[in-house]
Amino acid sequence: MHHVRQENLPFVGSSHEFVGAEHADTGVSVFLFHGKPGSGPGPHRHPYDEIQFILEGRGMWTVNGQTFEGGAGDIFVIKAGEIHSFKAVGDSPLIQVDVHLSPRFIQENL
């Protein structure tokens, strides 16, 4: 068992980053995104699936050219290779847990 405190994780951009291979020798990486309104990553893709659990706030997602609005309680499953981006919308932060099915974070920015 590994115990990692959130405050000990690197904070990059708008996310605490738990990279499985570095923090617990495990096959997944998890990011806690805490984005202010208007923030979010531009178009990118990963060579593995990603599952996003929306905890608070609202956002707009674009996946392979289709746009979706979502909020607390929604789950997005983004398949390997799908081009996607999202940004927080509204007046409150967007908080989500992003599970990357890979021990290492791999992202191609487009």
Regions found by a protein language model. Give the residues of each.
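Short beta-strand His + acidic residue motifs that chelate non-heme Fe in jelly-roll/DSBH
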Residues: 43, 61-62, 78, 84-90
